[in-house]
UniProtKB/Swiss-Prot annotation:
This is Ribosomal RNA large subunit methyltransferase E. The gene is rlmE. Keywords: Cytoplasm, Methyltransferase, rRNA processing, S-adenosyl-L-methionine, Transferase. It is an enzyme of class 2 (transferase). GO terms for cellular component: cytoplasm. Specifically methylates the uridine in position 2552 of 23S rRNA at the 2'-O position of the ribose in the fully assembled 50S ribosomal subunit. It catalyses: uridine(2552) in 23S rRNA + S-adenosyl-L-methionine = 2'-O-methyluridine(2552) in 23S rRNA + S-adenosyl-L-homocysteine + H(+). S-adenosyl-L-methionine binds at residues 85, 87, 113, 129, 153. Its main location: cytoplasm. Its EC number is 2.1.1.166. The active site is at residue 193. It comes from Ruegeria sp. (strain TM1040) (Silicibacter sp.). Belongs to the class I-like SAM-binding methyltransferase superfamily. RNA methyltransferase RlmE family. InterPro entries: RNA_methyltr_RlmE, RNA_MeTrfase_FtsJ_dom, rRNA-MeTfrase_E, SAM-dependent_MTases_sf. It is found in: Cytoplasm.
Amino acid sequence: MAKKPTGKNTSGRGQRDLTVKVKTARGRRLSSTRWLQRQLNDPYVKRAQAEGYRGRAAFKIMELDDKYRFLVPGARVVDLGCAPGGWAQVAVPRINALGEKSGKAIGRFIGIDLQEVEPLAGAEFHQLDFMDEGADDQVKEWLGGQADVVMSDMAASSSGHKQTDHLRIMSLCETAAYFAFDVLEEGGTFVAKVLAGGAEGELQKLLKQKFKSVANVKPPSSRADSSEKFVVATGFRG
């Protein structure tokens, strides 16, 4: 269960926020040092630690759902590339996967990833490549039917070349979209991370053929200097 922030500073350094500065160690690239310094000073990283979430990405799906309301009690959700499980921590209580909301429908959460994921009550994690032949049928079998939501925070390994990374993640996102077409219930929702860079127009065209509404959203918790956005497609036509 996520811990509630106490509002107290227990660092012993007084009651004001401190900016952490990281020295560049011998053998460490300057870019790595900058990333580490940004990570240590990121308010969402600090908040995730305080509230018991597995990563800052939890706030992204939280903010998207606050706006579009797709994680509702009784929803059957598939999370592609679910590690480390931060999105699951947000989704499980919202879809009532544990049945804690009396009188509300009980949802199902299936997370799949190439790596093993630490267990979480109310979530069902499986090691599976969603691009494998028959993966869609396997997921539907686990769900006991079609999904109401397919969501993805996946990103291809960074090459250090912006345009290459953009094309890689767009290819991954398009593959996830085709997976969603196979497993979504009519009226369902597809949510996926994209990187701006020019090729996202083709994905938009594809999704507009299959969904009633398609939006590009940059949630507040996405870093301002990042090209990251999320596509939220609602009203799957089947």
